[in-house]
């Protein structure tokens, strides 16, 4: 199945000059969503990890589903003010501003091996912040998995020392 045909391009969103890759048509289609999750799980089937860590919002959809299918725990990473317990955070740059990601301070135990999952790998900024959070808690990032990669933004240059798996590449 060509999953790329389920990704909708939205020009000039969230600001002029950016083409947003909308995954909601893929999520809406039962067969495409199942195929995407199955294939993403296959991409990491040879990796040994304990937890899936994923950021809100679309990362939750993919990460939690993959964690369930793979029999792993799931750790949500959220924007400020959304987690009820004590958190640690990292700031990072987006194409259109600065953002913070928070994780519960006890979400990853020292030595736990982590798979990071998100919907789109663009500049690599979010992924870098997620890696820093996992390391701050004593975890080890063994791989990162993304539904979509925007290769023209060259995110792998920033993440060159990490194992990166992507399903759809632009």
Swiss-Prot record:
Subcellular location: Cytoplasm
GO biological process, one term: purine ribonucleoside salvage
Gene3D superfamilies per the UniProt record, alphabetical: 3.40.50.2020
Pfam entry (one): Pribosyltran
One GO CC term, this protein: cytoplasm
Pathway membership: Purine metabolism; AMP biosynthesis via salvage pathway; AMP from adenine: step 1/1
Top EC category: transferase
Gene Ontology MF term list: adenine binding; adenine phosphoribosyltransferase activity; AMP binding
Reaction(s) catalysed by this chain's protein: AMP + diphosphate = 5-phospho-alpha-D-ribose 1-diphosphate + adenine
EC number, as in UniProt: 2.4.2.7
Source organism, top-level taxon: Bacteria
Keywords attached to this entry: Cytoplasm, Glycosyltransferase, Purine salvage, Transferase
Family matches, as PROSITE patterns: PUR_PYR_PR_TRANSFER
Annotated InterPro entries: Ade_phspho_trans, PRibTrfase_dom, PRTase-like, UPRTase/APRTase
Family according to the record: Belongs to the purine/pyrimidine phosphoribosyltransferase family.
Function: Catalyzes a salvage reaction resulting in the formation of AMP, that is energically less costly than de novo synthesis.
Subunit structure: Homodimer.
Descriptive protein name: Adenine phosphoribosyltransferase
Organism of derivation: Thermotoga petrophila (strain ATCC BAA-488 / DSM 13995 / JCM 10881 / RKU-1)
Lineage of origin: Bacteria, Thermotogati, Thermotogota, Thermotogae, Thermotogales
């Amino acid at each position: 199945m060509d999953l790329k045909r389920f990704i909708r391009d939205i020009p000039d969103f969230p600001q002029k000059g950016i083409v947003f890759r909308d995954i909601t048509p893929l999520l809406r289609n039962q067969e495409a969503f199942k195929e995407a999750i199955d294939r993403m799980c296959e991409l990491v089937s040879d990796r040994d990890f304990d937890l899936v860590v994923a950021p809100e919002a679309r990362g939750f959809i993919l990460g939690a589903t993959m964690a369930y299918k793979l029999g792993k725990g799931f750790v949500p990473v959220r924007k400020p003010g959304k987690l009820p317990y004590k958190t640690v955070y990292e700031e990072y740059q987006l194409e259109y501003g600065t953002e913070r990601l928070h994780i519960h301070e006890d979400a990853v135990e020292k030595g736990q091996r982590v798979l990071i999952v998100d919907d789109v790998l663009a500049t690599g900024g979010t992924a870098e912040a997620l890696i820093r959070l996992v390391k701050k808690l004593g975890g080890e990032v063994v791989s990162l998995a993304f539904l979509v990669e925007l290769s023209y933004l060259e995110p792998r240059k920033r993440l060159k020392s990490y194992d990166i798996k992507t399903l759809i590449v632009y």
